[in-house]
């Protein structure tokens, strides 16, 4: 691949609305929008809570559910923080709110010994920081 060609990698954070409140928590966590579950972590799914459920339904399933009201400002600030973090991989980063970043990686593939290694490095580091990411 010619390193002068643009190549964009999208980092999608499907659980960012949950992870802005807690990233390393094994408790069932839900994020509400108008008293409905909009986002939930895997422990919440595992006990049977579903997206779209009312908060009262979630509490009926388990009184150990931790709930937060969605905070889009907090999500944007975290996305901006993550964008700053990705500058270690490329100088070209674009925010695509509400839950994604675009990284221009065409010029840095050689440095990271290819796309597979770059994706693995980014994924491993984000996982260690407590984020769920899809690329």
Region locations from a protein language model:
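Residues that scaffold, gate, or flank divalent-cation-dependent active/transport sites
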Residues: 1-102, 107-109, 113-124, 128, ...
